[in-house]
Amino acid sequence: MATPDPTQQAWDPVALANQLQGVAEKSQKLLTGFLSAQPNSGQIGMGDASTLGGAFFDLMTKMMSDPTALANAQINLINEGMTVWRHAAERMFLGRESEAAPKDKRFKHPDWTENAVFSFIRESYVVAAKSVLSSVHDVKDLDPATARKVDFYTRQYVDAISPSNFIATNPEVLTTTLQTGGQNLLRGLENLLSDLDRGEGRLAISMTDKSAFRLGENIASTPGKVVFQNDLMQLIQYDPATPDVRRRPLLIIPPWINKFYVLDLQPKNSFIKWSVDQGHTVFVISWVNPDERLAKKNFEDYMLEGPLAALEAIEKATGERSVNAVGYCLGGTLLASTLAYLAAHDDDRIASATYFVTLVDFTEVGDMGVFIDDEQISSLEKRMQERGYLEAQDMATSFNMLRANDLIWSFVVNNYLLGKEQIPFDLLFWNSDATRMPAAMHSFYLRNMYQRNLLAKPGGVTLAGTPIDLTKIKTPTFLLSTREDHIAPWKSTYAATRLYGGPVKFVLSASGHMAGVISAPGSKYGHWTNDDLPPTPDAWFAGAQAHPSSWWPQWDEWVTAFDLGRVAARAPGDGELPAIENAPGSYVVVRSDG
């Protein structure tokens, strides 16, 4: 039997109290300085939670109507709580080893397991969190939208009250505070005030050292030229890397919710550079970061001034009428819409279509659905009408909430409680470089696609006077989804296999919405393939073959079938379009956070 460890770290409450008093005195000066620098224009914004009251009222009503289920949940909580108390007593008085902490990054510090007090706190939280979540999840007779909303926001609450997020109950924070004399908390407060100041009163959590990256130098650095531009986009043509190139150019249509260079972070994981190295003449749309002057730009404008304008420009630049096209996320939704538009006009300029993590059937959108209802959209539209656009931070916050522990609370702990210096990380630098969206376009997108799912219905959406029917698309299609995607759930993207009228190949990558896409050869993520397309995604996965390597070479093999031979390498500016400026261009450098 193990015996109590007399060397276990003892906390000195007097020393800690003295240090915290000193921190409080210094922090008062910092806070006073911050507040005096704020414009006298109202309180610090806290976001819009007005739509939650009705959902939780429905939840409580349904809970109270089933007292037996409520009583059973309480009994289960008491029983599990007694187990936690028993474990704590056995550890304290009998020297019992603490159970290993679950694989949860919040509790990786050894004291969460080795220290009796923090082990008890951790186990108590896990039991309480499980009880709350299961009680909410098991409530009967809630309509699906309400059930999803209360489940999502209950998880937000449970994540927020984790003991790892508080000074007094996080052993790593307490240890660091003792070791530094509270300097970590002062640095953390400085970080907090800096983020509040950068967000103009709204908390804009810093995720990485932004000063470590310069666009065009050590990120988004694949050589190329801007060869065309209009109000909505710049078109980049990349320099060739091979003596000859594939005749048919490759057009990449990224989303405009964020910026294209997620596909060009570093040479080792740049899909753009890798495609150039395979002999593609790569063109990429770099969308503008819009302001109030583009408030009236609609979804059809993005089609007309985006891919359709790019097709004309590419023909002038290369002499080639047709392209292979890739659409990423919202860019894929636009690509599908464009293909249906072209099909209606007997236009075959897109020879093959590749979709990265793209929704076209919005029947089931996962947790994103909690933000989509009449009340919330109307509130958002009102704010957008006042500004002319959706604030970049609004969308970024919504995405971050989908993975709150990774993208919110881990940074709260590291930045504000531990006072750590931020580490340069290319993907987080890109993630923090969010863009605004025109009011008219975003309202159309939310109403017609997310809320009403009209794109999946033949003729449900009309663009530039043309009814859009995805079933008329005969273009060969490659669908790439990712297994852990929290924005475009792969089982939802699979629905596209039943929509398109041409041949379809579906591939599933490991990891999530970004990492699974930029999974370069040599990365740790594999993929799954299945040439059959059964009616359900579960049936597809049951018959899929796992591959330990990147999906990129398989895609390149697929798209090679649509080549037209090879031609001498094309340099930007060789054709009818002169080079305007070096890649990555001037549109991409316009940030929303100044």
Task: Please provide the spans of the model-predicted regions.
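Amphipathic, low-complexity, repeat-rich surface-exposed segments
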Residues: 1-234, 245-246, 283, 496, ...
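Gly/Ala-rich beta-loop-alpha elbow adjacent to hydrolase catalytic centers
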Residues: 327-335
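Alpha/beta-hydrolase-fold enzymes
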Residues: 141-176, 316, 320, 338-443, ...
